[in-house]
Amino acid sequence: MEAARDYAGALIRPLTFMGSQTKRVLFTPLMHPARPFRVSNHDRSSRRGVMASSLQELISKTLDALVIATGLVTLVLEEDGTVVDTEEFFQTLGDNTHFMILEKGQKWMPGSQHVPTCSPPKRSGIARVTFDLYRLNPKDFIGCLNVKATMYEMYSVSYDIRCTGLKGLLRSLLRFLSYSAQVTGQFLIYLGTYMLRVLDDKEERPSLRSQAKGRFTCG
């Protein structure tokens, strides 16, 4: 009997250990990787780059980066003032999202002081490229460069280059050149399509005029 009991105990112990390990793996929360974000104070006079994997970590690093002593703050989206107060909503936001930290008594205000009109925006050109250089760590070699290209004010692409070291700089440069080649290819396709439309319109107008003159002569 004792031998059978020892044998049963020897079988149960590994199963119990496996069950505890499986439970630990299943119920341990998933750790999200750290992502780059931009944060600013209420009047946009100070901006910083922050790497964070969770909402709480972002708020904590933002308070340190902007040297804010109070703990009663509200995190909102800089573009429209939407409050970010849940982890689920925070994880749905993309990299390089711009946030604004509001202390007690402060309110979100739009970036421009003029009142927007309902008239459609005027196209100032075919493409616009903006560069945003910032540092996530004071010890970084150069910092991080965010390149954003907007074509026809409809299509927008962005790329984030992290230049924290010499090797990282070369690696990021090669990636940027490859990405630039892809963007240039897309831009040439859009430009070619636009030029074909312009040429087709110019060819159709003379043909319509000649048809109208022919009808007038026959009459």
UniProtKB/Swiss-Prot annotation:
Entry's Gene Ontology molecular function annotations: lipid transfer activity; phosphatidic acid binding; protein homodimerization activity
UniProtKB keywords: Activator, Apoptosis, Lipid droplet, Nucleus, Transcription, Transcription regulation
Main location: other
GO cellular component labels: cytoplasm; cytosol; lipid droplet; mitochondrial envelope; mitochondrion; nucleus
Positions in coiled-coil regions: none
Expressed in which tissues: Expressed in omental and subcutaneous adipose tissue (at protein level).
Domain CIDE-N intervals: 33-110
Origin: domain of life: Eukaryota
Catalytic reactions on record: a triacyl-sn-glycerol(in) = a triacyl-sn-glycerol(out)
Annotated region described as Amphipathic helix, given as residue ranges: 163-180
Gene Ontology BP terms: apoptotic process; cellular response to cold; fat cell differentiation; lipid droplet fusion; lipid metabolic process; lipid storage; negative regulation of cold-induced thermogenesis; negative regulation of cytokine production
Cell location: Lipid droplet; Nucleus
Family of this protein: Belongs to the CIDE family.
Function comment: Lipid transferase that promotes unilocular lipid droplet formation by mediating lipid droplet fusion. Lipid droplet fusion promotes their enlargement, restricting lipolysis and favoring lipid storage. Localizes on the lipid droplet surface, at focal contact sites between lipid droplets, and mediates atypical lipid droplet fusion by promoting directional net neutral lipid transfer from the smaller to larger lipid droplets. The transfer direction may be driven by the internal pressure difference between the contacting lipid droplet pair and occurs at a lower rate than that promoted by CIDEC.
Free-text comment about domains: The amphipathic helix mediates embedding into the lipid droplet phospholipid monolayer, promoting phosphatidic acid-binding, thereby facilitating triacylglycerol transfer.
Quaternary data: Homodimer. Interacts with CIDEC. Directly interacts with CEBPB. Interacts with isoform CLSTN3beta of CLSTN3; inhibiting the lipid transferase activity of CIDEA.
Disease: In omental and subcutaneous adipose tissue of obese patients matched for BMI, expression levels correlate with insulin sensitivity. Expression is increased 5-6 fold in the group of patients with high insulin sensitivity, compared to the insulin-resistant group. This observation is consistent with the idea that triglyceride storage in adipocytes plays an important role in sequestering triglycerides and fatty acids away from the circulation and peripheral tissues, thus enhancing insulin sensitivity in liver and muscle.
Protein name per UniProt: Lipid transferase CIDEA
Taxon lineage: Eukaryota, Metazoa, Chordata, Craniata, Vertebrata
Gene name in the database record: CIDEA
